UniProtKB/Swiss-Prot annotation:
Keywords: Aminoacyl-tRNA synthetase, ATP-binding, Cytoplasm, Ligase, Nucleotide-binding, Protein biosynthesis
Assembly description: Homodimer.
HAMAP family linked to this entry: His_tRNA_synth (MF_00127)
Taxonomic lineage from the root: Bacteria, Bacillati, Bacillota, Clostridia, Lachnospirales
PANTHER family in the record: HISTIDINE--TRNA LIGASE, MITOCHONDRIAL-RELATED (PTHR43707:SF1), HISTIDYL-TRNA SYNTHETASE (PTHR43707)
Entry keyword annotation includes ATP-binding: yes
GO biological processes: histidyl-tRNA aminoacylation
Superkingdom of origin: Bacteria
Name under which the protein is recorded: Histidine--tRNA ligase
Main location: cytoplasm
EC number(s) reported in the record: 6.1.1.21
Gene: hisS
Length: 417
């Protein structure tokens, strides 16, 4: 037990760690181009933040949070998602005092106690963006454009954008009445969870994954039929902007997202098999829910990195391989150790990926190891090489050897990389 990781977690190393790093680097590169600043918030927050922000009736709050009492009996929760913590930090640090909208991104661990499955873990890592301060649909379009670019660059080029509008608090109340009336006619055929949901928050029934419930909600009232004038105009402007930018989309009235803070626009990117790659939407009431003195519109999205990695593998998308070791510096004799490591340090300072021997192996064993780790070139340094100031650099693929002054090795490797 002590040598086994907890259920629903991963150890990151080797190729998986490298692929995860590529995804995170791409996220940071794109956010830099969009002038979105990185934010890091605590791994844990006061439980009430998620109860008020995410929503008391959500599965996340009711069933999936890792919550505990600290040594002073304060209720603390490991963050199940990134938005609530980012908005809390935005408010606490008075970021709203800055002129213009505030655009933040994070790459963070998140924790949910749910049944582990492919691409879904109890500890996962989330790339998310929060665009705070704009009520314009252009804010949604900016995030949708960023995600579209991200998915194309990472290799998931067939992802499709699905959008919906679930309205604001006012039109949602009218819709909930109509939905509840409809659901009551089919209550006997709903799953036990949805029978509870329909009383507390009927919109959650639309999100149910049980086949019987999915069949029932096919004919349920649609949120877009109950939008007030403002929400309707917002949704129409969003569609117009997407058309103008040639971003294809599909209106999917089954999207409501699983968190209570969403208003107006909700969206998901799905693959060809209909599995969600990432999702987000507008949450104009979340800031006010956390701090009643503030009322600031916002929009954001979250993307599970493990989920992206899972679909990259499933769809057989090849990512760039790890950079090869450019040079292995072999050591012949104890007297050459210091000088060899001096060369290694110089090469690394030039940005050349370099390895050497730390195990006092024979030269034959060192060359075998260099071949095993995929070194592109090797060089052996011993007393003769140091005395002459010359050494032979061997290309491991062709077997070709080139005699060089020691001080020219770095330039040679860089030129032939």
């Amino acid at each position: 037990m002590i040598t086994q990781r907890p259920k629903g977690t991963l150890d990151w190393y080797g190729d998986n760690m490298y692929k995860r790093t590529l995804i995170e680097e791409l996220a940071r590169k794109l956010c830099k181009a969009y002038n979105i600043k990185e934010i890091i918030t605590p791994v844990f927050e006061h439980t009430i933040l998620f109860q008020r922000g995410v929503g008391e009736t959500t599965d996340v709050v009711q069933k999936e949070m890792y919550t505990f009492l600290d040594k002073k009996d304060r209720s603390i929760t490991l963050k199940p998602e990134g938005t609530a913590g980012a908005i809390r930090a935005y408010l606490e640090n008075n970021l709203y005092a800055e002129s213009g909208p505030t655009k933040l991104f994070y790459v963070t661990p998140a924790f949910r106690y749910e049944q582990p499955q492919s691409g879904r873990l109890r500890q996962h890592h989330q790339f998310g963006v929060e665009f705070v301060g704009s009520k314009s649909p252009l804010a949604e379009v900016e995030l949708i454009t960023l995600i579209t670019t991200f998915l194309k660059e990472i290799g998931l080029k067939k992802a499709k954008l699905h959008i919906n509008s679930i309205g604001c608090k006012n039109c949602r109340a009218t819709y909930n009445e109509a939905l509840l009336t409809y659901l009551r006619k089919h209550e006997d055929h709903l799953c036990s969870t949805c029978k509870e949901r329909m009383q507390k928050n009927p919109l959650r029934v639309i999100d149910c994954k049980e086949s019987a419930c999915k069949e029932i909600v096919k004919d349920a009232p649609r949120t877009i039929e109950y939008l007030d004038e403002e929400c309707k105009n917002h949704f129409e402007e969003l569609q117009s902007l997407l058309h103008t930018l040639n971003i294809p989309f599909e209106i999917d009235t089954g999207i409501v997202r699983g968190l209570d803070y969403y208003t107006k626009t909700v969206f998901e990117f799905v693959n060809e098999d209909g599995f969600t790659l990432c999702g987000g939407g507008r949450y104009d009431g979340l800031v006010h829910e956390i701090d009643e003195k503030q009322d600031i519109p916002s929009v954001g999205f979250g993307m599970g990195i493990e989920r992206i990695l899972y679909f990259l593998e499933k769809e057989e998308v090849s990512l760039p391989p790890q950079p090869a070791i450019e040079l292995y510096v072999g050591i012949l004799g104890a007297e050459a150790k210091a000088s060899a490591y001096q060369l290694v340090t110089k090469l690394r300072g030039e940005g050349i990926i370099t390895e050497t021997d730390y195990m006092d192996r024979s030269v034959k064993a060192q060359m075998k190891y260099a071949n095993k780790i995929g070194a592109k070139n090797t060089v052996i340094l011993g007393a003769d090489e140091l005395a002459k100031g010359l050494a032979n650099v061997k290309n491991m693929e062709t077997g070709e050897q080139t005699e060089l002054p020691l001080e020219d090795i770095a330039d040679f490797i860089l030129k032939n990389a």
